[in-house]
Amino acid sequence: MANDTKPMDQIIDLTRELPSRIKPLLELLLGNLVFIGEIPAPTFHEQKRIKFLVQRFTECGLQNCSIDEKGNGAAILPGETGEKTILVAAHADTPFDSTVNHSFSISSQYVAGPGAGDNSLGLAVLATLPTIMARLNLRLQSNLFLLGTTSSLEKGNQEGIRFFLANKKTEIAAGIALEGILLGRLGFRSMATMGGEIICRFNTLNEKDSGAIDLLNQIIHQLRKRIRQQFNDATLVLGAVDGGASYKTPARSARLRFLVRSENDDTIEQTMEQINQIVAAVQHDSSSKIRFDVIVRNRAGGLEIDDPFIVQTKRIMKALGILPLEINHSTNTSSFMEQGIPALCLGLTTGENLNYPDERVAIAPITTGGAQLIGLLFAIDGGCCGQY
């Protein structure tokens, strides 16, 4: 392929050819997926997985292979001119503890294992992308900055990518966040979100005490009521409740994990004030101690649907027969938005049982997901996505 950048029609033609050209390299990609997936990487404990990724970068001859203070693994694939830099990132952590059996299996249609789609495949594509580009003789004018990020999920609150972007020494023209599933995912806006945790504890239970779970139920009821009455633009998601030791005794402790989201940052701030008021009132009327902690906080914003970045991405998806999903929000873009960097999130294949130990990803669509990524890189590189 010639070194010059290409207008969009030529990029579309190239993109249509890519799935069949990538297919001979699929075995290499799947090997990286299994190697990466079998390394446990719960949030805050991704070191071994990042070390493997950087080793792959080094083997590919990339520049500036390194691990920063937050454990992010980075490398640069130099462009022909290097006039701008495109960032491709994938989070390394998964929602599975290291005690979970991380053995992966491959069948004719699927790769299965804990975290296969979230986000071992994203990291495997990141690790394999330099080899794919080299084998297919694909060269960008722009530098390609590859980044495996840490501390993304739950209490991590995207700490790794936020640290990198806040301390970057290179100007980033645009960013792409990779998620293993779902193909068709096109996230370019971030909702205002607050992920919270409420923990209720009794030192001792008196006869009149109804227990920690009952108090959480009171809090949930009040929170639902206030959101319904005061914030019609907010949504409450009850993620998990756990606590207690037996069916026959009131629980001495219990925990609620939940999410509130809205298009409006002020709504989230006001909701947090309401939660503090509810918690204080319930605690006052009991002998318990109740603590409310904010675990995740993201601001609203992102790109508009008619932004050239999104328009051209949809052209690429259409050329590959990918139907964009209706949901266009992604927390992966919020950290980019905070730094004024245009970014979107792409899914790479289809899959099942997300965030369960028997999670699995479909093999065949991966070549299409990879073609989508490469096509978009050339569109950004060629100046087809507006000012990026």
Regions found by a protein language model. Name each.
Residues 240-277, 330, 334-344, 349-355:
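Active-site-adjacent mobile loop/cap segments within catalytic or ligand-binding domains
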Residues 208-242, 249, 266-289:
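Acidic-enriched catalytic cores of C-N bond-cleaving enzymes acting on peptides and small amides
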Residues 92-106, 172, 187-198, 344:
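Acidic-glycine-rich active-site phosphate/pyrophosphate-binding loop
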Residues 34, 38, 73, 237-244, ...:
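A short beta-alpha structural unit
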Residues 64, 139-141, 225-238, 282-294, ...:
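Flexible, glycine/charged-enriched surface loops at secondary-structure junctions
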Residues 115-195, 228-229, 246-248, 259, ...:
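Acidic/histidine-rich catalytic neighborhood of metal-dependent amide-processing enzymes
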Residues 5-110:
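Acidic/His- and Gly-rich active-site-bordering loop/insert found
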Residues 241, 322-383, 388:
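Zn-dependent metallopeptidase/amidohydrolase metal-coordination segment
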